[in-house]
């Protein structure tokens, strides 16, 4: 059972994967996947060693055919000859026979329930009687059990890896595109593992949508608990993208689950060199696990909160904050920043700027400001903020919106009475404790339990230099992940004691909100990291598409290396670019293919032309 307010890792069963253990009392493992051709032994060994030297503890390789699966033997030998004992994981799709071969040479084999026995997804609705559905499950078991026996004989671990983008038509026909269907896709295989007493299993459920990813993993954990299953979990946001956005998106999803103690191994999927994923994963793990042994957070969960199916907490809007409004962004000028010199991007300008004890001399027209309550003089578009010990003064100050800084442990009777009497007050929830998520959740649940509808803005303070901006972004995204997905967030206020600019901080705030599907400020790219199946230059293609579409705010564009998740993830994108074979690309509008197998040299131009023409019709 997850404790919302106190960090502790979920107890999972240990799984031996070659030279390491996943789950049990082992540390959270970090891993990556090669992008080289699995038939190219030398290239695979070289790239795997770069991953290992960066700190990777497992290396996954695509094995799309028998030839690739058999070459794992040579790759393994090459690594061992160089003194590396790091386990190799075979990634198998569409061909159960390949999984049988891979189990002979890899320390772990990943299979995808969406295409292990079921045919490739074509988005076809299939009507099954209960008897027919049971027959399909029997086919699955008849094929899966011999594979488990091979793995048992060769001490090979198994990952049952569900992807939202590659659910089978069978599952989709019976359950729809729902968290329940995604979880059932995994549970079908786990029930067979339990029946066969095969315990060397790791599981994963991934999606490019962080909300779906977090909610389905939570539901999976709940269903496993009911079935007395304790398999370790592999976490990841698939097709997260690259650069800052890819890191932020991964941190929102992975961080939300790690913060609840869920996760035994992680992979941060970036459309970059695979070794670049490892420092990101390690920082996330280190940042979250430092909470172990924190001071107890005494709190009671609101009876209205549902961790498995959270809905936004009901609040009464104060100005444009809370209610049905999108979460706001508050920012603060740095101590060495001159307000007149700061230029925000039009799409990421903060809704409110905190100025301390004095307003800037050159105020921006239409910009809202926050000042300390004892410096507030009722200026237009200006609002007072009160520390928790100044609640007696709130009633004497006239303003449409007032901000009150609160931390768990403040005299509750005093501030609860104040909030009840003043619906115009927005709570700014802060914490300086090791487990800030637990404290901020606890404070919000206390308001909820007491029937208060004041909006809540979560304020997070960090200490990073400009050179450490990436760490700041990861930590902020991880801290906000669960708060946003829980439906508790009416606003975000990131602060930093360092030289990261207020513009960068504002950009990060908006990126975090977009990663959680709460507020859109730019084009979103759902791009895979690539693997041995990718037969075109993924990174240069992403750069070309971004350069031509970055101004299309609100658009979601999928850029996929191959068909494994490509068509499925297109359902979450407006347009898509999917590898279809050597030098060939297929283009999609959502999940409908609009052009097949066009030459790679023409594909970006075709995509951009189609987007422009389609947008003109709207």
Predicted ranges, named:
Residues 1-32, 148-154, 290-338, 547:
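N-terminal amphipathic alpha-helix/helix-capping segment at the start of soluble metabolic enzymes
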Residues 3, 56-188, 319, 331-438:
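Active-site beta->alpha loop and helix N-cap motifs at the rims of alpha/beta catalytic domains
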Residues 30, 91, 160, 203, ...:
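Conserved, mostly hydrophobic/aromatic
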Residues 38-50, 94-99, 250-254, 337-345, ...:
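Short, acidic/polar
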Residues 53-58, 106, 198, 262-263, ...:
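A structural motif
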Residues 57-60, 106-122, 259-275, 487-502, ...:
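Glycine-rich phosphate-binding active-site loops on the catalytic face of alpha/beta enzymes
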Residues 127-144, 149, 171-321, 398-403, ...:
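Catalytic alpha/beta core domains of metabolic enzymes, predominantly
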Residues 582-585, 592-616:
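Beta-strand/loop-dominated core regions that host nucleotide or nucleotide-derived cofactor-binding catalytic loops
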């Amino acid at each position: 059972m997850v404790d919302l307010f106190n960090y502790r890792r979920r107890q999972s069963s240990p799984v031996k994967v070659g030279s390491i253990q996943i789950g049990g009392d082992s540390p959270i493992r970090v891993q990556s996947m090669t992008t080289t051709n699995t038939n190219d032994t030398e290239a695979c060994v070289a790239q795997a060693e770069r991953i290992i030297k960066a700190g990777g503890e497992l290396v996954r390789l695509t094995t799309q055919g028998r030839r690739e699966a058999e070459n794992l033997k040579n790759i393994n030998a090459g690594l061992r000859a160089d003194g590396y004992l790091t386990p190799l994981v075979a990634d198998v799709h569409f061909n159960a026979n390949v999984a049988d071969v891979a189990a002979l040479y890899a320390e772990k084999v990943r299979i995808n329930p969406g295409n292990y026995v079921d045919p490739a997804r074509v988005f076809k609705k299939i009507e099954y009687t209960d008897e027919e559905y049971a027959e399909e499950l029997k086919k699955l078991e008849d094929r899966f059990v011999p594979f488990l026996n091979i793995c048992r004989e060769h001490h090979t671990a198994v990952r049952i890896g569900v992807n939202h983008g590659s659910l089978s038509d069978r599952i989709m026909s019976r359950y729809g595109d729902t968290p329940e269907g995604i979880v059932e896709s995994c549970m079908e295989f786990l029930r067979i593992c339990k029946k066969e007493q095969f315990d060397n299993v790791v599981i994963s459920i991934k999606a490019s949508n962080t909300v779906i990813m977090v909610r389905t993993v939570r539901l999976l954990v709940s269903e496993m608990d009911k079935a007395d299953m304790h398999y370790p979990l592999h976490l990841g946001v698939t097709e997260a993208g690259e650069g800052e956005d890819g890191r932020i998106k991964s941190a929102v999803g992975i961080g939300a689950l790690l913060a609840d103690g869920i996760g035994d191994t992680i992979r941060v999927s970036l459309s970059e060199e695979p070794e670049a994923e490892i420092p990101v994963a390690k920082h996330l793990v280190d940042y979250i696990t430092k909470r172990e042994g924190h001071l107890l957070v005494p709190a009671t969960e609101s009876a209205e909160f549902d961790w498995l199916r959270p809905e936004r907490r009901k609040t009464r809007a104060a100005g444009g904050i809370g209610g049905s409004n999108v979460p706001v962004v508050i920012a603060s000028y740095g101590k060495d920043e001159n307000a007149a010199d700061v230029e925000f991007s039009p799409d990421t300008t903060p809704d409110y700027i905190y100025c301390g004890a004095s307003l800037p001399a050159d105020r921006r027209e239409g910009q809202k400001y926050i000042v300390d309550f004892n410096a507030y003089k009722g200026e237009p578009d200006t609002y007072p903020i009160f520390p928790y010990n100044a609640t007696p003064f709130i009633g004497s100050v006239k303003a449409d919106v007032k901000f009150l800084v609160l931390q768990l442990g403040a005299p509750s009777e005093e501030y609860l009475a104040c909030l009840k009497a003043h619906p115009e007050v927005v709570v700014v929830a802060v914490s300086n404790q090791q487990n800030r998520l637990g404290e901020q959740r606890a404070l919000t649940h206390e308001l909820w339990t007491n029937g208060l509808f004041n909006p809540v803005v979560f304020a997070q303070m960090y200490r990073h230099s400009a050179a450490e901006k990436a760490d700041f972004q990861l930590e902020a995204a991880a801290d906000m992940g669960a708060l946003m997905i829980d439906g508790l967030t009416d606003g975000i206020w990131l602060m930093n004691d360092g030289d990261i600019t207020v513009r960068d901080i504002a950009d990060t705030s908006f990126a975090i909100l977009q990663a959680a599907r709460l507020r859109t400020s730019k084009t979103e790219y759902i791009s895979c990291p690539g693997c041995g199946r990718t037969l075109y230059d993924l990174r240069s293609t992403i750069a070309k598409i971004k350069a031509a579409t970055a101004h299309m705010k609100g658009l979601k564009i999928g850029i996929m290396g191959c068909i494994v998740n490509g068509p499925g993830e297109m359902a979450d994108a407006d347009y898509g670019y999917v590898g279809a074979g050597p030098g060939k690309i297929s283009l999609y509008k959502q999940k409908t293919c609009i052009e097949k197998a066009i030459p790679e040299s023409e594909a970006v131009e075709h995509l951009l032309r189609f987007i422009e023409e389609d947008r003109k019709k709207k």
